[in-house]
Amino acid sequence: MGVNEPPKGVITETVTDVFEDSALGSTDIALEESNGHRNVNKSSSTDAENMRRMGREQELVRNFRMFSMASFAAMATAVWEFALFQITPALVDGGRPSLMYSTIWNFVGFLPIYLSMAEMASMAPIAGAQYHWVSEFAPRSMQRVLSYVSGWTSTLALQAGNALGVLLVGTLIQTIIVVNVENYSAPAWHASLLVIAAVMIAFTGSVIGYKVLHYWQNAAFAIHVMAYFAVLIPIWVNAPEATHAQVWKGFENTGNWNSIGLAVLIGQLPGISFQVGIDAAAHMSEEVRNASTAVPRAMLLTYALNFVLLFPMILTACYHLPDIQPALDDSTTYPFVYILKQSMAAGWVTLILVIIVIILIGSNITFLSATSRDLYAFARDDGVPFSGWLAQLSKRQQVPQNAAIVTCVISFLLALIYIGSDVAFYAITSLFTVALLQCYVLSIGCILWRRIAHPDTLPYAPFSLGQWGVPVNSAAVLYGTWSFFWAFWPQSYPVTAEGFNWASPLFMAAVFAALINYAIHGRKKYFGPVSLVEGRKNE
């Protein structure tokens, strides 16, 4: 079967396939099957054919449509909100120009990455995403071990990202207190308790409130956009401004590297981090109607919209930092809060931060949903301990509740680690960006290999790169590898335990542990998702 040929029996468009988003999410109507039974999972004929090809039963309910999934991905990444509290590394290494330019070049560099993943999500729209794609597209002799390692690193990355999201909520609540209470010291155990509360809220919204999750995504996205202007405009009106030369040419090397060029390349880590995570939509594929079309569109729409919101906000931050060092030394530890304090009274700063915290709580709910789907999918393929239990769905909500519980417990435990050492906590969660990049590069590298070696075995994709597949995939692998390399560098020189980027040893330890676990247990029961794929089962 060629990449441009639909499989036999697939109805590419019918009247019943056209399901539009309502004003607040997705229409909640069950379709009638041709045999008279209700289609409780809300699958279209194309969805059913895709699941049949991949050897899967439809267990989850397809409540999401394209626009509600784009809103979901935008909320999961919450790009301008998270970005404002991640800019410190770029200000230390390279200064304002480093932050500006790296935001632009990483947006451009990630385009082939998301085009490639959008195509794979169209070929195989499934919750496992990257590890499934590795299994389906890798060489036969290597697919089991490569997809197993990719499954572990993907799972660890999303677990780390989930913990980072709830921690930011906790520390921002402490920041609100610091702004209003002069003598508050913001002890770590307070943050940990706030993290636990944030995790419980996320679980409630993601699992207990799952049946209404898809309804409020578009409304949440609207708030996400309106709050953006509520933050942006007062800063431009009131905050002191830097000069054009400071913003575009005023490179700095506070990290003490031996050249400005090296400092700028090391300082691009925020620019890289701003771009990862949009593939959260791919992990929700089994809950999106007409997923092979809707998910790729949602990913690319989110990719574009995120930059439209992100770059003006980064521009705003850079133009309203006339002096970087006081911002880095601010008692809240967040340069952006320093900018807010220079542009408005404490009461307004508090209001802005409260709005951001509310949006981030919504982001935590969506990200927990994507993280639990990834763990559920890997457990379904016997990739983790206690797979049978983790792959179970709750009978009432019809969601992977057990996977969500484990995800919350992991965040609880990491919150306890934060009490003893914030360095240890950030060391573990630093896996988020590098592990995701590894999954991106490996899965795209596998489809590039198959596209060159066995193009006739690529499944049909409504969103296909066609003749541009090889150059786009190649560019994606190259840029993903480039980003992966720079994501390991520490923030300053000489390197200290506090300033060391622990992602490198922890990532290697995670890969080594996955290989050991595969050798002991995985090779006996993990066969890779391709073992179920139609036409590939006997390879």
Model-derived regions, located:
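Helix-loop-helix junctions that connect adjacent transmembrane segments
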Residues: 183-190, 218-344, 349
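Helix-loop-helix connectors at the membrane interface of multi-pass transporters/channels
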Residues: 131-143, 166-193, 282-292, 297-303, ...
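Membrane-interface loop-to-helix entry segments
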Residues: 190-248, 276, 299-303, 429-440, ...
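TM-loop-TM module centered on a large, flexible mid-protein loop between adjacent transmembrane helices
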Residues: 132-143, 178-179, 254, 304-365, ...
